[in-house]
Amino acid sequence: MKFKYGAIFFSGFLGLSAILAACGTKGKFDQVDDGKIKLASSLTSKSASKALQAIVKKYNEVKKPGDYPIEITQIAGGYDGGRSDLQTRVNVKDTTNFYNLILNYPDLVSTLGRVGMELPFDNVKVDKLSPRFLDFNNRISAISKPGIYGIPVSLSTEVLSINGPVLHYILNNAKKKEGTLNQKMTSSSEGKNSSGTLTVATDTETSSLWKKIEDSAKANGKSDEKGKGKKKDNKSATFSLVQLKQTQEKTDDSQDTKNSDDQVKKSWGEYQEVDGVLKNFEFKASIFENWHDLLDFSTRVAKSFKKIHENSNKKGNDIQGILGVDSTPNSLFTSVFAAGGGDYNNFFYKIENGRADFSNFKNKGTSYQNLQKVFGDFKGLIDKNGIFVNKGGSYSSNFQKFHQLAYSISSTSGFFYSFAGKSAKRLNFGDSFIEYPRFTQEIKAPSKNGENGQTNEGNSTNGEQNLLGTFEVKDDSKPKEEVKSNKNSGKESSQNQGKKSNNNKTIYLYETKIPDGKTAGDNAILIKDKNVIEKLKSAAKEENKEQTAEATKAAITSNKAKSTKKESSKVIGYTTTDSVREDGKNIFAIDRVNGENYDRKIIVGAKAETLNQSSTLQSEEAIVLPAPGKYLNGDPKKVTITQGPNIIGIHANEKENAETQKFVDWFLNSPQTWEKQSRDKKGSSEKQTAAEFFAESASYILPLKEIFDKNDTKTEKGKNSKTQQRTNTYAEKALELFKQISQNQIVSYSDPSDFRSGKFRDAIGATFNAAVSSKADFNKFVQNFTATLGSDI
């Protein structure tokens, strides 16, 4: 349905929806009482999943006799997969395999409410939670009565993460130099067209931000080997004191910042001074506080670098833009909401009297007009190729950590994915790359001796010919005593690579068939994809050619054992259980090893490389600010998004409903002793509720009153529980913002919840992302958006 034709149809559809909601009880059904509580989870985070498993285990250990046990029902596909699965079970009235609880977003409550399957948490104490984070329950359509239907157990918000070294390079080149109004001489990091005229404002906020930008560049410049820049310093010693003064900026133009600028310049290229762009522009900290100024500044920067505005067909190794946006629906929703004064009456739709009202957008009211303004601001940046948007799993942090973006807007839950390690490693595919995934094993080529250098051990010749490669995984089936014994057994055990050694075991990859003596899932995986097979074989042949001379030399010197060992260590691919996305080119899905809870991928056609630290963004080099909270700088209200899954109840039957609420109350209110899993706290324990344990484990925040009431919230809760080296600055910023929400200092935004809100969100995001690629104008964007919505809205 297209809005410009469909006023009558649209109103009719909403009326029909209201009727369906009112008649929801007709679709209500009871589930079979099977004596257990099922919790549906589609979590993709390993830390969150492990925490949930620990919680279920703990509850089943401490529950009273006669209380129902709880178990996890795993759903694939993330939150969208969970939404689809629930809708299907509601539609078919699944009485036997449905669940009692689900971790997902509150629009599912509306889906349940349409058929009377929502479960209010009437017997759950929620008084420990800040009421501001429960009021979204007042904005859920189709429910039968007011109440608490969703409980936020893992909140996050969005931050603007600035790549300090990159922004320093941009501003340092654009800045007016002290005493150089007509000075042509430039530093070695500047090009012939880069004599800057930009000025930095002197207000307190801007001065503080500029110092942070300087400090991040210094830290980045220090990260490589010391002394590299000192030679260049000596060469410049012939400059007179006057010349040195002229080439210095008001900031500390130290060797460290110069090292950083020089490194960034390698990928960003020369700064170009352009009339009406950054020429005579005044840089202020307030630029990052509102959408209009942020997008205007970003567009100006994009126009100043040829590698951005002249490149409309970016490859993975290219600079991706100035601004990265991980969730375009979030950015569009919050900017339009802010432009409407933080009032849901001025938003795309609102929930009123239990019904969703989309008339504001349909009638081209304030939300439509504000969307047009916001889109216009984005359009300038889009046209100059200055924005990167996440189109399905490729997050801004994947590029920002390699200096390919100046700043990005992303979730506070992504802190541990946002920065490079001290030794930044990635897999390069030639024209693109990915950061070296966690939980990754190297795939070794089979040796001429047999399976990875071992004797045949009864395997057939065909089995050897079918062998593509091997990798090792931890052998969880081996008793700890055996592992300890093997660790002390010396070099002989460690060299026995083809058999179970230490706490590892070898997994064999075969084509065509798995030979006798090997078992699929236990110690073998059958590779079926022809592309994977060919690339593994090709990599093995390539390695053989490269090492022929060396292997021959080793044989001549009668060092055959060393040659065999070297041959067996050839890397021809990688395999991981981390959440990397299949691309059908270099990354493919393969079968899991028995006991694994996460999908396994195989990565082929990649070369591992380790970069200098100055080529990457470390957490201490990022400047973390709130995502823009206003549309215009002068707007009276500041807006912050709150997001994250809720625990949602589903009607089953009288007994299971009571047992479900009993578990949720325990989850929120019963302190238990939990063993910590983080490296720095391994073996230690802490007493806290299951909800607190879950939020901490998953890098989320539980909106407890006591947290927001403390004056030292930032320092107490900002410390990262996973490593002593890094402080979770994203969590610090989230707590700071949530505290302001709790104290009514800023306005919280979350999507009004309707059974159609998920489709509305998905459609506006997909259509905007397509407009970024096609550079569509606003009219075309709206036309495509409404067409995508179809008759559902």
Curated annotation (Swiss-Prot):
Family: Belongs to the MG185/MG260 family.
Membrane topology: Lipid-anchor
InterPro entries: Lipoprotein_10_C (IPR004890), Mycoplasma_lipoprotein_cen_dom (IPR004984), P68-like (IPR054825)
NCBIfam families reported in the protein's UniProt record: lipo_P68
Gene Ontology cellular-component terms listed: plasma membrane
PROSITE patterns the UniProt entry points to: PROKAR_LIPOPROTEIN
Compositional bias of kind Basic and acidic residues: 212-227, 247-264, 472-485
Protein name listed in UniProt: Uncharacterized lipoprotein MPN_506
Localization annotation: Cell membrane
Compositionally biased residues, Polar residues: 237-246, 449-468
Signal sequence bounds: 1-22
Spans annotated as Disordered: 181-200, 212-264, 444-504
N-palmitoyl cysteine: lipidated positions: 23
Annotated Low complexity bias: 491-504
Main location: membrane
Residues with a covalently attached lipid (S-diacylglycerol cysteine): 23
Gene3D superfamilies: Periplasmic binding protein-like II
Upper classification of the organism: Bacteria, Bacillati, Mycoplasmatota, Mycoplasmoidales, Mycoplasmoidaceae
Keyword field: Cell membrane, Lipoprotein, Membrane, Palmitate, Signal
Keyword Oxidoreductase included in the entry's annotation: no
Domain of life: Bacteria
